[in-house]
Structures are given as C-alpha cells and as structure tokens.
C-alpha cells in the first residue's frame, strides 16, 4: 500500500471519527432539549393575553399599512379554516393582531381619521382608492374596499368574530407628537 493511499485512509478515518462525534453530540443535545419545555419570559403587562378564551392561539404582528390589512384577512381566514377543517368555533381561538410601527394608525377610530387623517404621513397611511386623497376614515374599518390588502375584511368583522388588538404605545406617542405639530396642537391632547 502506498503512503499516499495510507495517508488518505488515515485522514478519512479521522474525518469519520470527527463526524461521528459531532453527530453523537448533536443527538445528545437534541435529546436533552426535547425533554425541556420552552418558557417565554413573563411580564405583568402581558397578563391580559392569558385571560383570552381559546386554546388555539395566534399572534399577528403588523408593522405597515399593507401588513395590517393582510393581518385582518389572515386572521379571518384562520378562524374560517379552523371551523371548516377542524369543526372549531371562533371562541376556540385566541387571536391577537398587533398594530405597531407604521401600522399603528389603523388601530385609530374614524373620529381620529376625520380629524387627523390628512396629516398622517404617507408611510403610515394609504390613499383612499375611491378619492385618490388622504383618507378621513379608517379604510380598514369601512366596507367597500376589497382591493386593499385586507381583501374586504374589516376591523368590525374580525372584532365580531372575537379577534383582539394590541396597539404600540411608543408608535402612538410618536404619531401624537407628529400630528400635534402638523395641526398646531399638543401631543397630550392628540394622544387622548
């Protein structure tokens, strides 16, 4: 047997040993992890989520106007699919849509949109496809907007089905300041 061939076989044997050790280690780690249960950090501010009825849980995090609309459509589809596929009622699911960052403004009611809608920056709002202008109502709360990312699913519809909303306080504070400045008011008054 030549030295080149012996050298190759020696390296091959060492490689197999290393691979076997690595494989055995990963199996041991996987076995150890399989026995433990993941526990997320708990905060008092999140206790309200444990009070929601429903064993099938889903959280959708929306950060843009389009993703907020998509979250409405997806949440509605989630409930429908659970009913059709598993015979579950809407009350069997606990679904939360989080409106944060640029999606936050879509958690605001029509009174806010009527007063401040034209001042909401384009990055946080969608022009009304019917008027081609800044909206003075929450487009996702109104019917007749089937071409938006919500595909016609509205906030009142998902609320009626038991969907819950969480709204980013940091973004709301930011927008209150921005809207107050644009309209010559005070951020605290806008925030209320």
Language model segments and positions:
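Solvent-exposed loop/turn segments at secondary-structure junctions
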Residues: 65-67, 101-106, 165, 170-175
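A cross-taxonomic marker for long C-terminal extensions/tails that follow the last structured domain
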Residues: 130-192
């Amino acid at each position: 047997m030549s030295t080149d061939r012996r050298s190759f076989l020696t390296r091959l044997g060492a490689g197999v040993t290393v691979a076997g050790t690595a494989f055995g280690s990963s199996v041991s780690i996987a076995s150890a992890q399989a026995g433990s249960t993941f526990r997320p950090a708990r905060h008092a501010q999140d206790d309200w989520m444990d009070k929601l009825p429903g064993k099938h849980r889903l959280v959708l995090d929306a950060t843009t106007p389009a993703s907020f609309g998509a979250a409405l459509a997806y949440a509605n589809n989630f409930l429908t699919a659970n009913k059709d596929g598993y015979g579950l009622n809407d009350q069997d699911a606990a679904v939360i849509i989080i409106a944060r960052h640029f999606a936050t403004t879509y958690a605001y009611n029509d009174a806010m949109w009527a007063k401040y809608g034209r001042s909401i920056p384009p990055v946080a709002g969608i022009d009304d496809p019917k008027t081609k202008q800044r909206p003075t109502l929450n487009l996702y709360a109104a019917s007749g907007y089937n071409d938006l990312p919500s595909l016609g699913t509205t906030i009142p519809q998902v609320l009626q089905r038991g969907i819950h909303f969480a709204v980013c306080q940091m973004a709301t504070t930011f927008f209150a300041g921005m809207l107050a400045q644009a309209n010559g008011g005070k951020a605290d008054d806008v925030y209320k």
